[in-house]
Each structure stands twice: as C-alpha cells, then as structure tokens.
C-alpha cells in the first residue's frame, strides 16, 4: 500500500489496561505499524486506537465504585481517569500510537458524535431503520430498566457450565433471548426483574439480501 491506517481494538473505559490488552492487542498492531513505516514511510502510516467511552461495563463499574464510596465524580470523570491510565500504560510500553483518544473525550468525542448522527440520519432518510419493541428487564424496586450486565442468572443453553450468565449471553459465549435466562436477578436490588417492552431502532439488514 501507499498509505495505511493501522487500528487496535478500543478497550472499555471501565478500568486500566491489563497485560492481555498489551500482548494480545497492542503489541501485534504496533509491530505491524512499525513494519509499514519502514516500508512506505512514517508519514504514510497512522496507528490509531482509543478508549471506548460507552457500554454496560462502564456503567456497572462506575455504579459499584460510587455505591462503595470509592469514587466521587461523574461517569465522565471516571472514564477520563481510566483513559489517562490506559494512555500512560501504552506510553510506558513504548507503543507507537499516533492517536489515542476517546469516543466521548474532547475533540474526538465531538467528531464521533457528528459522524454517528450523520450516519444514523442517512440510514433513517433512506428507510433502512425500523422501530421495533422488544422485551427488556426492568427492576420495579429500583424503577429502572437494566443493562445487560445488571442481570444475572443461569444460562439456558443445555449442557452449558457457565458460572455467569447475563441478560442475553453467558461468559462462555452462548447467546439467547433475554426472556430465556433462567432465574434472573437484578444486580441492583436482588429482586427478580420484570420483562417490559422497549422501543429501539433496528437496521433493516434483510433489505440488503441479494
């Protein structure tokens, strides 16, 4: 190639990096980026990654720390703290990233929002989005819908020996419908959650079948 963009998977902003992130994600990508710089010139290569600032693991990690009195700040503060720790770790391992930002941090966050909005708007204008109601877990005691990590039960897949099953997947990788989860419990209050309908937008993938 004459120009190249090398990317490394974006870690969640719920914690610092561990060695698996370094050895399994960033070192291989770094080796490839350095190889390309040697072959086509550093000015023609961009090695990019960053912190994923959204998702259930972040919400759940933040909630647990706040409830335990171990963090006093907003969820944005929590993510930014972990982002800075991640960046420091990558620098200490001399990972040669050109850009390490975040999907909701600073200018990169603004760009992420603009592109996401434009993308969704285009899909909507072309009729490729459909609004559908699906059942989701609701904690009547907490008065809130639960994200995937806030529900735990037993995996409904026959023969599965997973010790942790969440709203729609277990830690062994089995997927299932939320209503099939066995003996679900809310991690917020410990009560059995209700199933209530929630409307979301879905991409009309069948419209693109050949």
Regions found by a protein language model. Name each.
Residues 1-210:
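N-terminal, positively charged nucleic-acid-binding surface of large information/translation enzymes
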């Amino acid at each position: 190639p004459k120009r190249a963009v090398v990317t490394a998977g974006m870690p969640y902003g719920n914690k610092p990096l561990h060695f698996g992130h370094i050895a399994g994600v960033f070192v291989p990508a770094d080796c490839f980026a350095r190889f390309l710089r040697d072959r086509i010139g550093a000015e023609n290569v961009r090695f990019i990654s960053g912190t994923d600032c959204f998702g259930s693991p972040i919400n759940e990690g933040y909630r647990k720390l706040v409830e335990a009195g171990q963090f006093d700040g907003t969820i944005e503060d929590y993510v930014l703290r972990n982002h800075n720790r991640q960046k420091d770790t990558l620098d200490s391992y001399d990972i040669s990233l050109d850009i390490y930002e975040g999907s909701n941090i600073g200018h990169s966050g603004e760009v992420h929002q603009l592109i996401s909005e434009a993308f969704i708007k285009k899909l909507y204008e072309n009729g490729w989005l459909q609004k559908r109601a699906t059942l989701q877990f609701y904690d009547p005691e907490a008065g809130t819908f639960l994200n995937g990590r806030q529900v735990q039960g037993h995996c409904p897949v026959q023969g599965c020996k997973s010790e942790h099953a969440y709203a729609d997947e277990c830690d062994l990788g089995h997927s299932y419908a939320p209503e099939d989860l066995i003996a679900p419990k809310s991690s917020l209050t410990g009560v059995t959650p209700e199933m209530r309908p929630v409307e979301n937008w879905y991409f009309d993938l069948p419209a693109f079948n050949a």
